[in-house]
């Protein structure tokens, strides 16, 4: 069979079902994963219409290679991560395409080091292409983790005396089956929005990082007078927040709320966040007396950094946040929501009150520019050379982030397509636009060359 190599991406395997990602390929993925695994394999899947078939064929392949399978069935990605803790097994597979459009599906793979990414995905593809699989007779057992996951969340999150009304937008994704009910059990007054499972995503794609997907949540918060709005992505590992006024709270500012609640008691005084985050976050954290450190964008890099540096808390602009002070160090948006609700329920402060002392910056959204695979490195290198010639302060752990002192410019190549991503910021709108125009001129010169 012909394999579309491009669906083996930096962090996962993801493609259009039946066109790029077939049931036959799912079988081979199962054979290959069972070949590299040590111990039992936990497998779960999201609510997409193709997930059951991919799950079945993955298990068939894994059994053919002698795997012992624990099939936890329908779940969110954080539930699969928790299953690794619950069963004390390392190797796990989540069948999901997260926030992608309805025609997509995919596989997230975990080994003894956590989420597999980068060269491990390349090596995994090469194993499939070689066909050098183990043979054996496996066994599959099933387990519904819902009760245990719910019990874990409730044991870790106890709300205070203030009653909180929260609008919860599940975007018709897999979190519909779990998150609203668990939040109700915590004592939250939940106003559901798009909490009916529908794999066609009729209202919006379940991606809270896209501002247009948050408009209905913003309006609903204002309509019902809620304390907060909470959005979950398709598989439950990313969060989006709206304040009591209906304003978007970007993830870097959500992280600031968390840090303000833990900085006095946390053991590790370094706050880590990805290169897309605002200077306002960096300045605010340093004003609290914390050290700050930029990290590469990507949930796999985030979890690796948390584990290696024993950070108490870290996150990235896209909505992945990892708690390691009272939790397991992986990205669970329901737990993240619980931590925010715990803070709010123990104070009379509103969400917006946490930003009254935050320095003002004007930022663009993160924008994707299609440039073709062949131009991604050229553009990043051209911007780097230009910045060096200007003797700008540069952070180059993930593309190029130019630190102007009154804002920044970020240019990095996307790991998921033929794009570069850009973001610009200034202390005034004019300064932001100056930074943007300066760097976009370099980008356009390369594109038009």
Residue ranges and their predicted role:
Residues 92-98, 102, 221-243, 248, ...:
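Glycine-rich phosphate-binding loop
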Residues 1-68, 91, 142-166:
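An N-terminal, well-structured beta->alpha segment
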Residues 69-78, 248-251, 273-274, 295-296:
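Active-site nucleophile and cofactor-binding loops and adjacent substrate-binding regions
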Residues 41-104, 182-242:
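N-terminal small/polar loop signature for handling phosphorylated ligands or for N-terminal nucleophile
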């Amino acid at each position: 069979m012909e394999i579309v190599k491009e669906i083996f991406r930096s962090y996962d395997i993801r493609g259009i079902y039946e066109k790029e990602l077939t049931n036959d390929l799912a079988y081979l993925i199962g054979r290959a994963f069972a070949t590299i695994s040590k111990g039992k394999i936990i497998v779960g899947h999201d609510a997409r219409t193709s997930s059951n078939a991919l799950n079945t064929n993955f298990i068939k392949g894994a059994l053919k290679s002698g795997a012992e399978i624990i099939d936890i069935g329908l779940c969110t990605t954080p539930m699969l991560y928790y299953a690794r803790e619950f069963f004390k097994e390392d190797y796990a597979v989540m069948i999901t395409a997260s926030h992608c459009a309805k025609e997509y599906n995919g596989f997230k793979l975990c080994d003894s080091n956590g989420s597999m990414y980068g060269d491990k995905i390349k090596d995994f593809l090469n194993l499939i292409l070689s066909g050098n699989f183990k043979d054996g007779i496996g066994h599959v057992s099933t387990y519904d983790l819902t009760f245990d996951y719910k019990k874990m969340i409730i044991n870790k999150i106890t709300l205070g005396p203030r009653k909180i009304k929260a609008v919860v937008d599940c975007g018709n994704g897999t979190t519909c089956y779990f998150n609203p009910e668990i939040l109700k059990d915590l004592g939250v007054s939940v106003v559901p929005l798009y909490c009916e499972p529908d794999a066609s995503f009729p209202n919006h794609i379940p991606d809270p990082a896209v501002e247009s997907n948050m408009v209905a949540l913003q309006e609903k918060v204002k309509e019902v007078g809620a304390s907060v709005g909470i959005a979950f992505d398709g598989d439950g590992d990313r969060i989006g927040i709206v304040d009591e006024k209906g304003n978007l709270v970007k993830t870097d500012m959500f992280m600031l709320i968390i840090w303000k609640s833990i900085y006095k008691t946390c053991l590790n005084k370094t706050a880590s966040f990805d290169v897309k985050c605002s200077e306002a976050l960096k300045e605010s954290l340093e004003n609290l007396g914390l050290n700050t450190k930029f990290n590469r964008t990507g949930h796999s890099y985030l979890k690796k950094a948390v584990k290696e540096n024993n950070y108490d808390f870290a996150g990235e602009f896209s909505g992945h946040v990892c708690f390691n002070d009272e939790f397991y160090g992986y990205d669970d948006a329901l737990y993240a929501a619980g931590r925010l609700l715990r803070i709010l329920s123990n104070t009379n402060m509103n969400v917006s009150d946490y930003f009254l002392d935050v320095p003002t910056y004007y930022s663009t959204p993160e924008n994707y520019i299609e440039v073709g695979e062949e131009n991604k490195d050229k553009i990043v290198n051209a911007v780097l050379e230009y910045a060096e010639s200007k003797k700008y302060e540069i952070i180059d752990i993930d593309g190029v982030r130019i630190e102007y002192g009154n804002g920044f410019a970020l240019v990095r190549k996307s790991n998921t397509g033929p794009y570069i991503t850009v973001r610009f910021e200034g202390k005034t709108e004019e300064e932001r636009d100056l930074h943007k125009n300066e760097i976009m001129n370099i980008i356009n010169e390369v594109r038009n060359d």
